[in-house]
Regions:
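Polytopic transmembrane helical bundles with strong interfacial aromatic enrichment
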Residues: 1-196
Length: 196
């Protein structure tokens, strides 16, 4: 039973990260132009896949925590890594709401990403960086057995915060460098945005 739950948990994580990284790459390639209808459909499909995978991760994660507690009720919740992973997944989930209701409508709008106002570009870049860092760090916590009962919550979250800040800096610099060739934007004017 536990092995099957772990398998489903890992499979959902792999599907999510793979889908997100491929979609990020596709968005980067289209940064100078408006997305086509096919690209928007692919983005919507990816969002649905990641949402379903996140639901599976929550269900299997809670199941694994329950199993772990019954196996070792005296000490299981003293493992600070569990609370750190829970915190990261909560942040990841809340950021998913931001991506869905803020970033997504901006990305599929009638402007290329690099034509959006600077504040929108920064928020899209930062929310994307937070998503990638959070997914990868949550997965790392899942395999970091040497952190069990050895690192405290604050230390783990400090590492996470450092990675998030690094992700924000990288996202900012990537967007800044991408704007250097802004005059060469190729806008796809043949797409009717009212049908999106």
């Amino acid at each position: 039973m536990k092995t099957l739950v772990v398998y489903a948990h890992l499979l959902a994580a792999c599907v999510s990260i793979g889908s997100l990284l491929l979609q990020d790459l596709a968005l980067w390639r289209s940064r100078h132009r408006v997305l086509t209808q096919d690209e928007i459909s692919a983005l919507r499909n990816t969002a649905n896949i990641v949402f379903m995978a996140l639901v599976v991760l929550w269900v299997t994660g809670i199941t694994l925590v329950t199993i772990g507690y019954f196996e070792n009720p005296q000490e299981y919740f003293s493992n600070q890594k569990i609370w750190a992973k829970f915190s990261v997944v909560v942040i990841l989930s809340l950021n998913g709401v931001l991506l869905h209701f803020y970033s997504f409508p901006k990305v599929v709008g009638n402007k290329a990403i690099l034509e959006l106002p600077s504040v929108d570009q920064k928020l899209i870049g930062c929310s994307g960086a937070l998503s990638t860092v959070s997914w990868l760090f949550a997965c790392y916590l899942g395999i970091a057995r040497n952190w069990n009962y050895s690192l405290d919550y604050a230390s783990i979250m400090l590492v996470y915060a450092g990675l998030v800040v690094t992700g924000f800096i990288v996202a900012h610099e990537v967007m800044r460098m991408a704007r250097l060739d802004l005059p060469g934007l190729r806008i796809n004017k043949g797409v009717d945005r009212d049908t999106v």
